[in-house]
Amino acid sequence: MTRRNMGVHIAGIQLKNPVMTASGTFGSGREYSEFVDLNQLGAVVVKGVANEPWSGNPTPRIAETYGGMLNSVGLQNPGVEAFIKDDIQFLRQYDTKIIVNIAGRTVADYCKVTEKLGDADIDLIELNISCPNVKAGGVNFGTNPAMVEEVTKAVKKVARQPLIVKLTPNVTDIVEIAKAAVAGGADAISLINTLLGMAIDIHGRKPILANVVGGLSGPAIKPVALRMVYQVANAVQVPIIGMGGIATGEDAIAFMLAGATGVAVGTANFMNPRATMEVLEGIEDYMDQYNIEDIHEIIGKL
């Protein structure tokens, strides 16, 4: 096989290849390390961490659906200080970049967790703006352009690592939201997060999820994700990380053709612990098939 250039830059950080994990589906990599050589990944995006521990939502909080799954886990996490103490040293054993996804209930929450990560040995921060803003009546930060710009600007001001902003698809105009994130100082954009959905137990006549609604992920959302990645990539000048239903190399290639510089594998990890490796191998096979020497010959070449 001919040597191919798989390297990409995300917000000025060099990744050996475009394949990474999607936050919330890979923990901090420990559970998967016996199945996956973490050294082969472009980056590990860890499960979201907050300034303080979060207990998450009541159970049941996972439901299978046709072509995917619903989750209402509620960003359960031990807090940023426990993450720094327990997980960074483990990940630094591997030759991969570390991206920390952060969550918050207020702008101040986001800033506090970012400040605590300032001296941590990590590479990038991913700002999850799909959280409800408790100071704005519970409206999700990511659904209002003004709030997106405000929280991005505040976090960017205190961040010591490059900042990725992760967009929710539960909006009318994804381009408007992406532009607000860039105006606030986002160095890169990742999308999409989960689509809001619901499942009903027709025999018990009640919602299957205790939280009633949850986030839909998996193959079912891929067409929506591709459309939004394509729209955003054509509207902003920062790198895009595409996700939403990626399970094969062919899926990843489609996202890169639509304009994504990086691709994140999420729900597929639950069904196949080696999904990230198979996606990477699939990209390499595609490059060999079409005699592509550099990954950039694919990105945005629709």
From Swiss-Prot:
Oxidoreductase as UniProt keyword: yes
Cofactor note: Binds 1 FMN per subunit.
Gene3D superfamilies listed in its UniProt record: Aldolase class I
Residues noted as binding substrate in the record, renumbered to the chain: 47, 71-75, 128, 193-194
Main localization category: cytoplasm
Biological processes per GO annotation: 'de novo' pyrimidine nucleobase biosynthetic process; 'de novo' UMP biosynthetic process
Top-level class of the enzyme under EC nomenclature: oxidoreductase
Subcellular location, record wording: Cytoplasm
Cross-referenced InterPro entries: Aldolase_TIM (IPR013785), DHO_dehydrogenase (IPR050074), DHOD_1B (IPR033888), Dihydroorotate_DH_1 (IPR024920), Dihydroorotate_DH_1_2 (IPR012135), Dihydroorotate_DH_cat (IPR005720), Dihydroorotate_DH_CS (IPR001295), Dihydroorotate_DH_I (IPR049622)
Binding site for FMN: 23, 47-48, 101, 128, 166, 192, 218, 244-245, 266-267
GO terms for MF: dihydroorotate dehydrogenase (NAD+) activity
A GO-annotated cellular component: cytoplasm
PROSITE patterns on file: DHODEHASE_2
EC number of this enzyme: 1.3.1.14
Catalytic activity: (S)-dihydroorotate + NAD(+) = orotate + NADH + H(+)
Pfam families: DHO_dh (PF01180)
Subunit structure: Heterotetramer of 2 PyrK and 2 PyrD type B subunits.
Free-text function comment from the UniProt entry: Catalyzes the conversion of dihydroorotate to orotate with NAD(+) as electron acceptor.
Protein's recorded name: Dihydroorotate dehydrogenase B (NAD(+)), catalytic subunit
Gene designation per UniProt: pyrD
